[in-house]
UniProtKB/Swiss-Prot annotation:
Coiled-coil features, chain-numbered ranges: none
Single GO cellular component term: nucleus
Regions of compositional bias (Basic and acidic residues) in chain numbering: 160-170, 179-195
Location of the region described as Disordered in the Swiss-Prot/TrEMBL record: 118-195
InterPro entries, sorted: SCI-1-like (IPR044688)
Alphabetized PANTHER family for the sequence: STYLE CELL-CYCLE INHIBITOR 1
Protein name in UniProt: Uncharacterized protein C297.06c
Extent of Basic residues compositional bias: 136-146
Organism: Schizosaccharomyces pombe (strain 972 / ATCC 24843) (Fission yeast)
Length: 230
């Protein structure tokens, strides 16, 4: 089992700082940069307790084992790092970067799932089980996943709300989308009514012309009959 941490030891806190930050971000969805000093201290105390109780995932202990090695510990002091020290640090940084990437992907999937659920609640629904309903759900889900895949490709531009969700902002966008959808539906209905009215006008105009033609034929026939009888 990984050696225990003394949460009052400043040197150990500095050594485990990167793991601590990544653990809090991945496991608790908390960015230490947004926390005050008291909150950070409380999170560190909880982190140390869980670590010492052996209740963390093995990957955290694997990282801890690396930084606990003497070669890494010497990097904390003022002495000049050796090539071996730098290699250890690069390998540790690569592992931390991989953890960050996995954390982001997990956050993307969770947010996409939440947005899909909100879409199901807010958007007009086709009859349950219908082909249209299934297609609509797939379409909206693909759109949500596409948004977060694109965000994942531009990690440097990400904000915390992109990773962990701004529910009010998303609901506002959904409301606007629903309003646009309703407006388009209303516009289509108005256009349909106008087309129907135009068709009715054409039919009435054609019927009127046919009646006028029939009336003229009747008058012509009547005139011919009168000519025969005279």
């Amino acid at each position: 089992m990984q050696g225990k941490i003394n949460y009052k030891d400043i040197t150990q806190k500095e050594m485990f700082n990167e793991i601590f930050k990544e653990y809090v971000k991945e496991e608790k969805q908390i960015d230490l940069g947004t926390c005050d000093q008291d909150s950070v201290h409380d999170l560190w105390r909880r982190f140390v307790k869980r670590w010492n109780d052996g209740k963390m995932k093995s990957k955290w202990y694997s990282l801890g084992k690396r930084i606990s090695q003497p070669s890494y510990a010497r990097l904390v002091g003022p002495s000049r790092p050796t090539l071996e020290n730098l290699q250890d640090r690069r390998e540790l940084q690569e592992q931390l970067n991989e953890l960050r990437k996995l954390s982001r992907k997990s956050a993307f999937k969770s947010q996409a799932k939440r947005e899909t659920e909100l879409l199901d609640e807010i958007l007009p629904k086709e009859p349950a089980g219908s082909k249209e309903a299934m297609q609509q759900k797939k379409k909206e889900k693909r759109a949500a996943l596409k948004h977060y895949r694109e965000a994942s490709d531009n990690e440097e531009d990400l904000k915390e709300t992109d990773l962990y969700g701004d529910r009010d902002s998303f609901q506002s966008r959904l409301k606007q989308k629903k309003q646009r959808s309703e407006f388009r539906a209303s516009k289509r209905e108005m256009e349909r009514l106008e087309r129907d009215q135009e068709l009715r006008n054409k039919i009435e105009e054609r019927n009127k012309k046919e009646l006028e033609t029939i009336e003229k034929l009747r008058e012509l026939a009547k005139a011919r009959l009168q000519g025969f009888s005279s």
